[in-house]
Structure formats: C-alpha cells, structure tokens
C-alpha cells in the first residue's frame, strides 16, 4: 500500500512539473520594440563612444522598465552593417565604411542578455538605398561593383536583384556572418522584397524555368529564404519575416510567397505581419486582418507575432478613410490590440514600431502618454 502511495505521489509531482513547465512555455509572450536605423543615426552616429554607449544603456533600460523582453535591432538597413563585417561596410552608426570605434551589435547583445532581453537582428535583404543616388554608395559597399550589372536594380530606389544567384549568396553570407559570430536570438527580414513588378523580366526570359513570370519571382525569393532558414537552423537561431499585412500586396506585388512560408517547414520559424490598422479602418480592420493571417498558418510550429503601429498614436490615419480620426479620438488602441491578439491560436507575442514614438518626448502626441499607461495595464 505504501508503495502505491509513493508511486502515486511521484506521478503527481511529475505531472505537476510537466504542467508547470508547459504553462511557463505557453505563457511566455514576446514583447518587442523595433530599434531602427533612424534611432541608430540619432543616438550613435557622430557621437563619442561614451555618449553612444550611454544612449544604448538608456534604450535598453527604457525597454526593460516597460516590461518588454525583445529588441528588434536594425543591423542592416542599406547594404551595410552596424558591426565589423568582411562583407558590408559600416553604416547607420557611422558614415559608410567608417568604424564607430566599437562593436555596436555586441554591445547591444551583451546588454540585452544581461537584462534578460532577447535580441533579433533585423535585416533589409535587398535594399541598398531609398533614393536613386548612386553617388552615395561607397567603394566599400558590395553594391558598388555591381552598379552596372544585372545584380543591382535602380527603380525608385536602389536594390539588389532578387533573381540573381550572386545576390542570394551575398544575402546568405551576410546572415551566416552574424549567426556565426554573434549570440543573436533571431534573424528578422522585413517587407522589402521585389522592388517593382517587372524589374528582372529579361532575366526571366533568358531562364530555362517553364513557369509564369510571377511564379519565377516567387521562386527566386523562396530560394533565398530557404537558404537563410537553413543557415539559421544550423546555428540554432530563429528566423522570421515581418511582411506587409496586406496579403494580396505580398503575393502579387512583392513576390512574398507567404502561403508557402506558412505551410512548409523549410522557410521560417515565425511570422510578424505589420498589422498597422485600427479597429475602424474602412478598408481593413485589425480584427479581420489578424484572423486572416492566423488562417494562413498550416504549419503549427510557426509562431504568429503581431507588429503594431505605435507611430500612429494621436495621428490622423489618411489611409483609413472614414476611420482616419480613430488614433486621435482614442488612447487605448494598442492595449486593445494586444488583448485581442492574445486570443490567436498560434500567438507568440507582439512588437511595436518603433522606439522613438514610445520614448522620445519630442515625438509625443497628446495621446502618447495615456496610450502607454493603458498599455501598461496588460503588461504585468
């Protein structure tokens, strides 16, 4: 009898332990804040090392004090790097090709991990410049040698050609350099994929692929995504994408094959759609959009994170049509969007775009502080 009691007791505590671990796992919510090249320009570029590091200290302190646990740091915005690279020149934290005097990425990572904060390295894979100014590209930049080749496209900005195998190799090598040398927790690509609808039509015509032009473009992006995912898997680093929340735009204009990414197990670990809508947006409501994204996930191992538009707080939203004043008339939208997102089956967390709109008082609207206070109520 005593043996039975002991066995039952052991079984009870084992079950309790398993359930406790499971509860901790599912209750962990990633709460991210985007720190973009704009913040890096402001707080690091042209600053001495001590001032620069103190500014980073303040960024991490602010994020931690708001009960956030993920920094999404833009490490490559314009074919550059905020860390010493053998592939890309320094950029965002300094003039292109000029060292800031220390390893900014390593400093961010060490400080984040010291404060129990995750760090995802955020990359723009194809963008070189957001203008057509080729003169701004230094000879240190890998794009420089390709300016007169098919590997670079100039079309309302300067971009790497997604159809090029050399470009795919460049992007993959850049990711490998990060995950091999830095203790990042994740790699995140954003929504810059094909720069225009017909930028590489000649390459398509000369290819031996017997598919439509649209299928060709999807295939070229998918090849790059598979390559990067494979590299991240090898180094046990999560890989995800933060695409435009408009599903039609992704597939038909940007050649972002979200249907395949969310169904297969060879592309991504998480998806973070930029659901920059309110509840009264006339074209797309927040609720409908997050439900659409959840419905696309066929691989249950993929985590759904929702990127939220803190930059709209207190501002008119001209694209919302009849709902253009929603962000002006309300100061609890972010809080309500977080609560609603938590009901999603594959929910893994949320993120806010971007740091300065939350913590830089020179950018505050009349609603900012109240929106933050309301958000705090659901961030215990």
Regions found by a protein language model. Give the residues of each.
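Substrate-binding cleft of secreted/luminal carbohydrate-active enzymes
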Residues: 265-285, 300-380
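Active-site-adjacent "subsite" loops/lids of carbohydrate-active enzymes
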Residues: 28-54, 120-121, 126-177, 181, ...
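Aromatic-lined carbohydrate-binding/catalytic grooves of carbohydrate-active enzymes
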Residues: 66-100
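Catalytic domains of carbohydrate-active enzymes, especially glycoside hydrolases
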Residues: 54-80, 181-186, 266-270, 347-349
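Polysaccharide-binding and catalytic clefts of secreted carbohydrate-active enzymes
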Residues: 52, 62, 69, 106, ...
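Hydrophobic faces of well-ordered beta-strands that scaffold small-molecule active sites
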Residues: 31-35, 71-73, 119-121, 187-189, ...
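Acidic-and-aromatic substrate-binding clefts and catalytic sites of carbohydrate-active enzymes
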Residues: 41, 49-51, 76-81, 98-99, ...
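Alpha-helical scaffolding within the catalytic cores
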Residues: 58, 105, 225-226, 245-262, ...
């Amino acid at each position: 009898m005593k043996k039975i009691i002991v066995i039952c007791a052991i079984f009870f505590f084992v079950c309790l332990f398993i359930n406790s671990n499971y509860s901790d796992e599912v209750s962990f919510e990633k709460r991210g804040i985007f720190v973009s090249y704009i913040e890096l320009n402001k707080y690091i570029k042209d600053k001495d090392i001590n001032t620069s590091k103190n500014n980073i200290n303040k960024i991490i302190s602010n994020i931690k004090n708001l009960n956030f646990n993920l920094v999404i740091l833009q490490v490559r915005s314009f074919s550059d790097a905020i860390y010493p690279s053998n592939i890309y020149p320094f950029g965002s934290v300094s003039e292109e090709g000029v060292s800031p005097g220390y390893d900014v990425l390593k400093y961010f990572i060490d400080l984040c991990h010291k404060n129990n904060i995750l760090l995802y390295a955020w990359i723009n894979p194809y963008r070189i410049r957001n203008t057509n100014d080729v003169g701004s590209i230094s000879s240190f930049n890998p794009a420089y040698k390709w300016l007169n080749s098919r590997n670079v496209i100039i079309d309302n900005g300067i971009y790497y050609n997604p159809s090029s195998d050399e470009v795919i190799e460049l992007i993959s090598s850049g990711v490998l350099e990060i995950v091999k040398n830095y203790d990042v927790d994740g790699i995140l690509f954003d929504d810059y994929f094909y720069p225009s609808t017909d930028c590489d039509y000649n390459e398509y015509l000369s290819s031996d692929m017997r598919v439509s032009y649209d299928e060709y473009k999807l295939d070229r992006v998918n090849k790059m995504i598979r390559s990067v995912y494979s590299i991240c898997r090898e180094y046990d680093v999560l890989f995800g994408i933060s695409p435009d929340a408009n599903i039609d735009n992704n597939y038909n204009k940007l050649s972002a094959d979200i249907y395949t990414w969310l169904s297969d197990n060879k592309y991504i670990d998480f998806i973070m759609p930029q659901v920059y809508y309110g509840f009264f947006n006339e074209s797309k409501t927040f609720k409908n959009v997050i439900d659409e994204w959840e419905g696309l996930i066929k691989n249950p191992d993929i985590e759904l994170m929702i990127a939220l538009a803190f930059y709209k707080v207190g501002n008119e939203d001209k694209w919302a049509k009849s709902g253009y004043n929603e962000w002006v008339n309300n100061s609890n939208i972010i809080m309500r969007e977080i609560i609603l997102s938590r009901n999603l089956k594959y929910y893994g967390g949320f993120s806010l775009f971007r740091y300065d709109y939350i913590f830089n008082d020179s950018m505050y609207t009349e609603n900012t502080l109240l929106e933050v206070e309301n958000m705090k109520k659901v961030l215990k």
